[in-house]
Amino acid sequence: MKTVLLATNNENKVNEIKDILCELNLKVVSLKEVGINVEVEEDELTFMGNALKKALTLYNMIDDKKYMVLADDSGLSVDVLGGAPGVFSARYAGEHGNSKANNEKLLEDMKGLKNRKGKFICAMALVIDKDNIIKVQGEVEGSIGYEEKGDNGFGYDPLFFVSKYNMTFAEMDKDIKNSISHRRDALNKIKEKLKSYIEDK
């Protein structure tokens, strides 16, 4: 069976994906583990566009076709802002990865707005081979708070409120957050589709 190569060096992401896909008896490795150091520019207009670009770029770089390549792109989509921050989630305030500035800009943009519905979206693309690509999208719905709450997580987590749990992502225990997250939703879908693919072989 092939090995799944993850198009990321984010250790939290790597561990979460390994935990879920291990049920299929697949070996999962990160870029670091196979000695690849590459950044693919995320310049597509959709989460799926970025995920697909990353997965295909890496797949085409690798000579050893024993690898399937899994890539994802995710972010926050706010209804009243027309889907923003969207694909610009990580650089909403201009500087890439400045969560504090991004959260401040989001709060400023939503000042006085009553409709605070939003969702985290995770698009995943798994390139099995050039003729077989699995694409899925996971989501988790919530609302945008009026101030940051909680010390866990990262990014927009302190502002993302989930009414079922009456707390933000940043206030949740990591295991709870991971069990309901947009990434978990996408991974579960990938797992089911991959399971069907393996069974058909």
Swiss-Prot record:
Cofactor(s) this protein requires: Mg(2+)
Annotated positions binding Mg(2+): E41, D73
Protein biosynthesis is among the record's keywords: no
Pfam families xrefs: Ham1p_like
Broad class of enzyme this protein falls into: hydrolase
GO molecular function (one): dITP diphosphatase activity
SUPFAM superfamilies in UniProt: ITPase-like
Residues annotated as transmembrane: none
Domain of life of the organism encoding this protein: Bacteria
Cofactor binding, per record: Binds 1 Mg(2+) ion per subunit.
Active site: D73
Catalysis: reaction(s): XTP + H2O = XMP + diphosphate + H(+); dITP + H2O = dIMP + diphosphate + H(+); ITP + H2O = IMP + diphosphate + H(+)
Binding site for substrate: T8, N9, N10, E11, N12, K13, S74, F154, G155, Y156, D157, K177, H182, R183
InterPro entries: dITP/XTP_pyrophosphatase, ITPase-like_fam, RdgB/HAM1
UniProt KW keywords: Hydrolase, Magnesium, Metal-binding, Nucleotide metabolism, Nucleotide-binding
CDD domains assigned to the protein according to its UniProt record, in alphabetical order: HAM1 (cd00515)
GO CC, one annotated term: cytosol
HAMAP family referenced in this protein's UniProt entry, alphabetically: Non_canon_purine_NTPase
The name this protein goes by in its record: dITP/XTP pyrophosphatase
The species this protein was found in: Clostridium tetani (strain Massachusetts / E88)
